[in-house]
Amino acid sequence: MMRQILTVLAVLLLPVVTQAAELVPHRAVYDMGFLKRAHDTPYAQVDGRMVYHYDLTCTGATYNHRMLLILVSKQGQEIRSETFLSFYETTDGHTMRFDIRELLNDVVVVELQGTVKRPSVGEPGTVTYDKREGPEGEQLAEVPAGALFPMQHTDALISAAIDGSVIHNARTFDGDEVSLVDSFIQPSREPGREAGVVPETMADMKSWISRISFFKPDAEEPVPFYETQMRFWENGLSGDFTMESEDFGVLAELKEVELFDRPDCD
């Protein structure tokens, strides 16, 4: 699920916006459950928890994520799925370090560690893997010009929303593969279930609902392999969201939020 949770995509350069997003360091905890509308799913029950920690330094940003899912098949078999993600991206978008692990029933099935470096966002980047075990497909040696790293995409999406855009397209790289991502954005006019969870300081903060579809660049049919719908605020916090693939769907509900101060880099 790592690539499906993170990937994002379809312009060659970061979008030009009139107002930049002010992302805030934070920690968020989500309870995960079965999304009832998922069709043809092999699972009868899904439970889990996700912890997300976003932090800023004076030279870049870090993203740490742990997700645990307990899946029960229709035959009663229980599967324990864990995903660990750690990213560091420089502010200029020239460098990204990534450390990714996926486990099934406590056995490591995917492990990726490496670095991407490029002269600028508008130029191709070189991928160097320290470890690459488990993922399908050929190892990528070069990231295409204009591809956004995960946190770059988040920043670009929020900036587009602040600017009033209703559609945002991008090409993204998540440490393993390039995806094309189409996002449809609309202002959130209702407070939502999360109103009782987010800090009072966010009571008057703008938020949006976005439907985000992920496509493989070389797919024969323009059908998304993964979709998510989420509420997000202008400070970077995500509220409740869904994750849906062809045969699998999860609902995540925001349960805990901690906001932290931005670093003083003057």
Label for each model-derived stretch:
Residues Q19-E78:
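N-terminal cleavable signal peptides for secretion/export
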Residues A21-P25, H53-T62, Y88-H94, T201-A203, ...:
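A short, structured loop/turn motif at beta-sheet edges
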Residues A10-Q19:
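Hydrophobic h-region of N-terminal signal peptides that target proteins for export
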Residues A28-Y30, G48-M50, Y63-H65, T83-L85, ...:
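Hydrophobic residues positioned within well-ordered beta-strands of beta-sheet architectures
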Residues H65-S120:
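Hydrophobic/aromatic-rich structural module bridging two neighboring secondary-structure elements via a short loop
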Residues M1-I5:
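Positively charged n-region of N-terminal signal peptides that target proteins for export
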Residues D99-D266:
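Mature, soluble, non-transmembrane domains
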